[in-house]
């Protein structure tokens, strides 16, 4: 929502809090990352007369204008996330697109047809909620380093790769063909790669750590009937440190259970 695991995926489930139309993929095109803009990098179009930021090849201003033929007025207010942006505090927090920007992005990508306009605001809420959930999972992974440096991690950039199955997702789909009762048989509906800045110590710079997030649909919540999702978040297997962290992340609970420290 790839990591290689010997056990079943351990995925945290997040539940939608309002009615919405479930997208088949994230409608935001994260193929271009904003390394110099605090906004969620929504790719609108490639018109030749569009003014682009040369630092990230993104529009200088994302349209918040009402779309032609639009019937419902949508909010143009943007939500500020809890996710620190860039290398320093003065770069602030990442911002999410407004409902109007979300609709404009979908229309420009040809994904707006069939999406009720009155569902867009709920889609934005879910989009933001999933990103916040992913960040909380990353904070859990980074906690051991945060305790050492006393410096919170930050998000440098992120990109959407909905058409690229992670190795882990591909492996579980293959296992699902052999053991459908045990492993997932449906691919994730989206994938993001996030570049996280891990502190090397106060005033000692940052280390870039790539995280992979596979987003899965989950059975509706039994109590509320609302849609639910599973986020599988983990550091990419780019180096031995990430591989060690992934092994420890899963082996340590098993060790505690074997030692009788954790009961079923």
From Swiss-Prot:
It is found in: Mitochondrion inner membrane. The keyword Lipid biosynthesis does not apply. One of its GO terms (molecular function) is holocytochrome-c synthase activity. It is an enzyme of class 4 (lyase). Keywords: Heme, Iron, Lyase, Membrane, Metal-binding, Mitochondrion, Mitochondrion inner membrane, Repeat. It catalyses: holo-[cytochrome c] = apo-[cytochrome c] + heme b. One of its GO terms (cellular component) is mitochondrial inner membrane. Residues 11-21 have a biased composition (Polar residues). Residues 1-21 are annotated as: Disordered. Its EC number is 4.4.1.17. InterPro entries: Holocyt_c/c1_synthase. Belongs to the cytochrome c-type heme lyase family. This is Holocytochrome-c synthase. It comes from Candida albicans (strain WO-1) (Yeast).
């Amino acid at each position: 929502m790839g990591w290689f695991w010997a056990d079943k995926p351990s995925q945290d489930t997040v539940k939608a809090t309002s009615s919405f139309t479930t997208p088949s993929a994230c409608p935001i095109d994260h193929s271009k990352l904003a390394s110099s803009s605090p906004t969620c990098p929504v790719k609108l179009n490639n018109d030749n007369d569009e003014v682009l930021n040369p630092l990230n090849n993104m529009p200088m201003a994302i349209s918040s204008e009402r779309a032609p033929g639009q019937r419902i007025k949508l909010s143009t207010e943007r939500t500020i996330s809890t996710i620190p942006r860039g290398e320093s505090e003065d770069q602030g927090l990442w911002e999410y697109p407004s409902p109007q920007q979300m609709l404009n992005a979908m229309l420009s990508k040809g994904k707006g047809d069939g999406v009720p306009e009155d569902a867009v605001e709920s889609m934005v809420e879910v989009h933001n909620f999933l990103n916040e959930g992913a960040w909380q999972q990353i904070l859990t992974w980074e906690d051991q380093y945060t305790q050492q440096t006393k410096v919170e991690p930050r998000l440098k950039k992120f990109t959407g790769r909905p058409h690229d199955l992670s190795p882990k997702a591909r492996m579980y789909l293959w296992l699902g063909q052999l053991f459908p009762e045990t492993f997932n048989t449906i691919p994730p509906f989206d994938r993001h790669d996030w570049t996280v800045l891990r502190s090397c110590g106060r005033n000692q710079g940052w280390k870039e750590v790539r995280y992979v997030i596979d987003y899965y649909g989950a059975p509706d919540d039994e109590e509320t009937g609302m849609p639910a999702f599973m986020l599988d978040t983990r550091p990419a297997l780019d180096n031995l440190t990430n591989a060690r962290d992934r092994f420890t992340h899963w082996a340590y609970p098993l060790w505690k259970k074997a030692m009788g420290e954790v009961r079923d």
